[in-house]
Amino acid sequence: MRPSGRSANQVRPVTLTRNYTKHAEGSVLVAFGDTKVLCTASIEEGVPRFLKGQGQGWITAEYGMLPRATHTRNAREAAKGKQGGRTMEIQRLIARALRAAVDLKVLGEFTITLDCDVIQADGGTRTASITGACVALADALNKLIAAGKLKKNPMKGMVAAVSVGIVNGEALCDLEYVEDSVAETDMNVVMTEDGRIIEVQGTAEGEPFTHEELLTLLALARGGIESIVTTQKAALQN
């Protein structure tokens, strides 16, 4: 029995509260159980220097955790004077994932920055960030269309992510912290709404996993992501 009482293939309750802040073009408070992340999408005209004159847009991301998002306080990275390796890895993952959701040529020369700030962490902060940021991005793009700055929606479809892992020999979907901290295998999977893989990050923390276990985990992830995408689409209809 999992601590939450969930079945092995069941994701935590996922909520997506849109328009959570008033200034950003897109803003979403996403919750995967007790993991909560504020995701905002900000639009700027123009693109980075390496893309100028190419007629395409850019999507980038920043990620951070509030000092008391975890059990004990962590100093702000700004106070340390630099970002940690984990932070840089996660924000690059978020950006890569969301670029897969958009036709950058159709976007044109706009830059959209996705800021993901973890308010409370209970496992799966990067997967929650990707899921919430995708909805914030969709809202931001709709505002560009409403303002007459885009004729066509560059969004190709939803992108979502979930963690999977092996805990005490059992493959589980959407690990909370108490499961993640003892997992023999920990994996994050990002997919499009039609089940195509954008990224797989998998590590054997204890015991190496087999090819068959990998396929089991990917199947679990796909089922979880299908459920999450349904929630994303429902949120965008409200």
UniProtKB/Swiss-Prot annotation:
Membrane-spanning parts: none
Function text: Phosphorolytic 3'-5' exoribonuclease that plays an important role in tRNA 3'-end maturation. Removes nucleotide residues following the 3'-CCA terminus of tRNAs; can also add nucleotides to the ends of RNA molecules by using nucleoside diphosphates as substrates, but this may not be physiologically important. Probably plays a role in initiation of 16S rRNA degradation (leading to ribosome degradation) during starvation.
Keywords: Nucleotidyltransferase, RNA-binding, rRNA processing, Transferase, tRNA processing, tRNA-binding
Positions bound to phosphate: 86, 124-126
Name of this protein: Ribonuclease PH
Matching HAMAP family: RNase_PH (MF_00564)
Molecular-function GO terms, alphabetical: 3'-5'-RNA exonuclease activity; tRNA binding; tRNA nucleotidyltransferase activity
PROSITE patterns: RIBONUCLEASE_PH (PS01277)
Catalytic activity, EC: 2.7.7.56
Superkingdom of the source species: Bacteria
Quaternary assembly: Homohexameric ring arranged as a trimer of dimers.
Annotated Pfam families: RNase_PH (PF01138), RNase_PH_C (PF03725)
This protein's record includes keyword Phosphoprotein: no
